[in-house]
Swiss-Prot record:
Changing F208A: Decreased binding of Q beta-derived M-site RNA, 50% synthesis of (-) strand RNA, in construct expressing residues 1-273. InterPro entries: NA-bd_OB-fold, Ribos_protein_bS1-like, Ribosomal_bS1, Ribosomal_protein_S1-like, S1_domain. This is Small ribosomal subunit protein bS1. It comes from Escherichia coli (strain K12). Disruption phenotype: Essential, it cannot be deleted. Upon depletion cell growth and total protein synthesis become linear. Changing H219A: Decreased binding of Q beta-derived M-site RNA, 40% synthesis of (-) strand RNA, in construct expressing residues 1-273. Phosphorylated; probably on a serine. (Microbial infection) ADP-ribosylated and RNAylated (about 30% of the modifications) by phage T4 ADP-ribosyltransferase ModB. This results in covalent RNA-S1 conjugates and allows the phage to reprogram the host's gene-expression system. Pfam families: S1. CDD domains: S1_RPS1_repeat_ec1_hs1 (cd05687), S1_RPS1_repeat_ec2_hs2 (cd04465), S1_RPS1_repeat_ec3 (cd05688), S1_RPS1_repeat_ec4 (cd05689), S1_RPS1_repeat_ec5 (cd05690), S1_RPS1_repeat_ec6 (cd05691). It is found in: Cytoplasm. RNA binds at R139, R142. Keywords: Acetylation, Chaperone, Cytoplasm, Phosphoprotein, Repeat, Repressor, Ribonucleoprotein, Ribosomal protein, RNA-binding. Induction: Represses its own translation via the N-terminus (at protein level). Changing R254A: Decreased binding of Q beta-derived M-site RNA, 40% synthesis of (-) strand RNA, in construct expressing residues 1-273.
Length: 557
């Protein structure tokens, strides 16, 4: 009886393919923490690591009594045991599935689990496949994060088991699925209609939206009425959104989409809502070197130019005044509805130091401050409120030329001046230093009437004439032709530096601060006076003689 049973067992083994790598069916007879015991009808039961029976979530996929396919690793491993592998059996099954899918052009399910040069790796039931980057979608996809880790459908486009080479395409699946849907969409699509779609890709200039077999471009300028730096501020890959068809080129199958067009245009009649001079609050959305943008309502931004940020510092960087996100008060300066531009002012909502100065200072008032800078045309003095006043070169000294007088001053010096003029609108304050003292020129002219004989000292002379110092800070000019009664063509022949000169004050040019002198006119006047004196004396003598003769005649002498 025993011999016949052993004989029958040996014969049954012959019927089983026992070469290494063969696939046999077994029954799960026991499950332990680390191993699963499988009876495949061989000489002994085999212990297979439990890990080989777990799914991706780490859960056992079998229970006692289940039939499973396993691969023969070895019939006897030297200890009389048979080694089986569930992992190799699953891999064998996976290849069979792939071959069938490849031959029948069916889809397979897999997961994108890595990135390699030129594409991605996909796990297909334990088989590693290659997905070229160009076959991920019908359009180039830069970011695949929204696809990784998800179960997706693929088509096998190349299969070589010997070389363990599998190439798949997701694009082929999408094109196949979209074909019927695409035809229907293209037939019904019209400009102006609202459609739903899935954001599938973002670029710097917009987003591509899958409308169902047809991709449309949602340009960045059509995402929102407000300023958008990058599409990711408005939409993300995978978002389902409603958009409006703006343009549809049926022949080239190009669709332009709009998101902002779903709402009303906030720029319509904006000038009526915000007349020039209106003060309102807004949020700083962006900073540039030339200013900052402030959103005054949803979809409407205005520019505060750097020159409109601060009353006193025209070149201050915007980041020193405001930060992105700040809520600020601004004034509407100008609106160009056609160009969709609004000019806003920040400083106009603060006290104007120029206006304040104009209201608190009059012409002639004395002010003091530190010299902030010295330029080719004058001295800038710092005043209250952070503003500057200018002392022009011509207002530094009565007596010394501005270019020379300015050398007596340096940056940081405390200096006093007189207010000459205030133009708050043009933000200009004119100051004078020389006006702190009386004008010697005007004083001299007031004390000396035209025609008076004056004296002075020659300080400079050339052929054309001589400069004569009449008083401290007051000079007159004596032309060569006026230097003598005699004809003089070269003043140096009759005058020298240091000579005391007595001349007639013949004229004044207040604008150019020039006094005209004449020795000739003085001499002529002297001569005329002398003649008049002589004539007067002669007349007196004649009169006296005549009276004497008459007296004698009366006496009868």
């Amino acid at each position: 009886m025993t011999e016949s049973f052993a004989q029958l067992f040996e014969e049954s083994l012959k019927e089983i393919e026992t070469r290494p790598g063969s696939i046999v069916r077994g029954v799960v007879v026991a499950i332990d923490k680390d191993v699963v015991l499988v009876d495949a009808g061989l000489k002994s039961e085999s212990a297979i690591p439990a890990e080989q029976f777990k799914n991706a979530q780490g859960e056992l996929e079998i229970q006692v009594g289940d039939e499973v396919d396993v691969a023969l690793d070895a019939v006897e491993d030297g200890f009389g045991e048979t080694l089986l592998s569930r992992e190799k059996a699953k891999r064998h099954e996976a290849w069979i599935t792939l071959e069938k899918a490849y031959e029948d052009a069916e889809t397979v399910t897999g997961v994108i689990n890595g990135k390699v040069k030129g594409g991605f790796t996909v796990e297909l039931n334990g088989i590693r496949a290659f997905l070229p980057g160009s076959l991920v979608d019908v359009r180039p996809v830069r970011d695949t994060l929204h696809l990784e880790g998800k179960e997706l459908e693929f088509k096998v486009i190349k299969l070589d088991q010997k070389r363990n080479n599998v190439v798949v395409s997701r694009r082929a699946v999408i094109e196949s699925e979209n074909s019927a849907e695409r035809d229907q969409l293209l037939e019904n699509l019209q400009e102006g209609m609202e459609v739903k779609g899935i954001v599938k890709n973002l670029t710097d200039y917009g987003a591509f939206v899958d409308l169902g077999g047809v991709d449309g471009l949602l340009h960045i300028t059509d995402m929102a009425w407000k300023r958008v730096k990058h599409p990711s501020e408005i939409v993300n890959v995978g978002d389902e959104i409603t958009v409006k068809v703006l343009k549809f080129d049926r022949e080239r199958t190009r669709v332009s989409l709009g998101l902002k067009q779903l709402g009303e245009d906030p720029w319509v009649a904006i000038a009526k809502r915000y007349p020039e001079g209106t003060k309102l609050t807004g949020r700083v959305t962006n900073l540039t070197d030339y200013g900052c943008f402030v959103e005054i309502e949803e979809g409407v931004e205005g520019l505060v130019h750097v020159s409109e940020m601060d009353w006193t510092n025209k070149n201050i960087h915007p980041s020193k005044v405001v930060n992105v996100g700040d809520v600020v008060e601004v004034m509407v300066l100008d609106i160009d509805e056609e160009r969709r531009r609004i000019s806003l002012g920040l400083k106009q909502c603060k006290a104007n130091p120029w206006q304040q100065f104009a209201e608190t200072h009059n012409k002639g008032d004395r002010v003091e401050g530190k010299i902030k800078s010295i330029t080719d045309f004058g001295i800038f003095i710092g005043l209250d409120g952070g503003i500057d006043g200018l002392v022009h070169l011509s207002d530094i000294s009565w007596n010394v030329a501005g270019e020379e007088a300015v050398r007596e001053y340096k940056k940081g010096d405390e200096i006093a001046a007189v207010v000459l003029q205030v133009d708050a609108e043009r933000e200009r304050i004119s100051l004078g230093v020389k006006q702190l003292a009386e004008d010697p020129f005007n004083n001299w002219v007031a004390l000396n009437k035209k025609g008076a004989i004056v004296t002075g000292k020659v300080t400079a002379v050339d052929a054309k004439g001589a400069t004569v110092e009449l008083a401290d800070g007051v000079e007159g000019y004596l032309r060569a032709s006026e230097a003598s009664r005699d004809r003089v063509e070269d003043a140096t022949l009759v005058l020298s530096v240091g000579d005391e000169v007595e001349a007639k004050f013949t004229g004044v040019d207040r604008k150019n601060r020039a006094i005209s002198l004449s020795v000739r006119a003085k001499d002529e006047a002297d001569e005329k006076d002398a003649i008049a004196t002589v004539n007067k004396q002669e007349d007196a003598n004649f009169s006296n003689n005549a009276m004497a003769e008459a007296f004698k005649a009366a006496k009868g002498e």
